[in-house]
A protein has these predicted regions:
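Short catalytic/signature loops enriched in Gly
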Residues: 3-4, 17-27, 32, 243-343
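P-loop NTP-binding/switch modules centered on Walker-like glycine-rich loops
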Residues: 182, 186-272
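Conserved ABC ATPase "signature" region
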Residues: 82-83, 134-151, 260-261
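Conserved ABC transporter NBD signature motif
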Residues: 75-83, 95
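Conserved ABC ATPase signature
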Residues: 156-160, 164
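A short, proline-enriched helix->beta-strand linker immediately N-terminal to the Walker B motif
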Residues: 175-179
Length: 343
């Protein structure tokens, strides 16, 4: 078995909060938001790993820690066997070229005063991807790659639709010829029909360019159609990881079961008959003891309140739950594209 391209081990991130006047006078320590709590994760070369979970589960923080837009407090991040948390200078720039991120809001990541041509030329120049004479041809290639007309390169971001701006963000990421693409809520702000077009474009680009993709989303339909494997996050921890179709067919963790049961489905015969998670997401400032899901879990018992479960093998992958038994892994069918007319 080949080594993973990206390996995350024990990744922890806390965001310190301001103290109240009373806490300051009492010299109490600063409270902190526990965004990531010892995350372990691996991504194989050429695969798409979907990251799902409720808002506040730590998905986007994990993505930003991987590309070092946010520095983790503890843990290791290895890319192609190298600890990327130690990289600096030219080594850091080389990593930035190999791993690119596409953001949820393209308007916030594109300079409104620069045309698409200037944006793409800047990336090509900074990373020395082409000689000056070859930049126009490369820009034309990139526009064609994301299915935008060549003449659109001389327009500004505000002249495009949301889906087109997201394609420009993808083109900018691809301009430096990365190996790994991290898509953070790539299409969550787009209409459903446009979502299908962008997701199918991503599938096509992966097959054409051999990309490894980390796909962060809360929309389970998108994750199912795009991902080879899925990791489920809850309050800063990975609670279950499995091959995509195996996870959707037989979720092992109670949180995964509740997450799938909450997803809308027009076919009544396919609706999950699983108890829903109780209450609201607990505060990440004061995490529950033991298993962090136990206050909402319909199956919780005393051990869940006392002891945090470790990931264990299941019939479909791994999951962190005291209820689980050991079973043989299940066979997983292939992915399919989303129909262009919708999801």
């Amino acid at each position: 078995m080949t080594a993973p391209l990206l390996e995350v081990s024990g990744l922890t991130k806390r965001f310190r909060m301001d103290r109240t006047i009373g806490d300051t006078l009492r010299r109490k320590p600063h409270p902190a938001v526990h965004a990531l709590n010892g995350v372990d994760l691996s991504v194989r070369r050429g695969e798409t790993l979907g990251i799902v979970g409720e808002s506040g589960s730590g998905k986007s923080t994990l993505a930003r820690c991987i590309v070092r837009l946010i520095e983790a407090d503890e843990g290791t991040l290895r890319y192609d066997g190298v600890d990327i948390r130690t990289l600096a200078g030219s080594d850091r720039r080389a990593f930035n070229r190999r791993v690119q991120m596409v953001f949820q809001d393209p308007r916030g990541s594109l300079n409104p005063r620069m045309t698409v041509r200037q944006t793409l030329a800047e990336a090509l120049t900074v990373h020395r991807m082409r000689l000056k004479a070859g930049i126009p041809d490369r820009i034309a290639e990139l526009m064609e790659l994301v299915r935008l007309p060549r003449e659109a390169a001389d327009r500004y971001p505000h002249e495009f639709s949301g889906g087109q701006r997201q394609r420009i963000g993808i083109a900018r990421a691809l301009s430096v010829e990365p190996e790994c693409l991290i898509a953070d809520e790539l299409v969550s702000a787009l209409d459903v029909s446009v979502q299908a077009q962008v997701v199918n474009l991503l599938l096509e680009l992966q097959q054409r360019l051999g990309l490894t993709i980390l796909f962060v989303a809360h929309d389970l339909r998108l994750v199912r159609h795009l991902s080879h494997r899925v990791a489920v996050m809850y309050l800063g921890s990975i609670v279950e990881t499995a091959e995509t179709e195996a996870l959707f067919a037989a979720p092992q963790h109670p949180y995964t079961q509740a997450l799938l049961a909450a997803a809308p489905d027009l076919d009544p015969t396919r609706r999950h008959r699983v108890p829903a998670a109780k209450g609201e997401l607990p505060s990440p400032v004061n995490l529950p003891s033991g298993c962090t899901f136990h206050p909402r879990c319909p199956h919780a018992f005393d051990r869940c309140r006392r002891e945090a479960p470790l990931p264990r093998p299941t019939a479909t992958g791994t999951a962190a739950c005291h209820l689980l038994d050991q079973a043989a892994p299940a066979a997983v069918p292939n992915r399919q594209e989303i129909p262009a007319h919708g999801l």
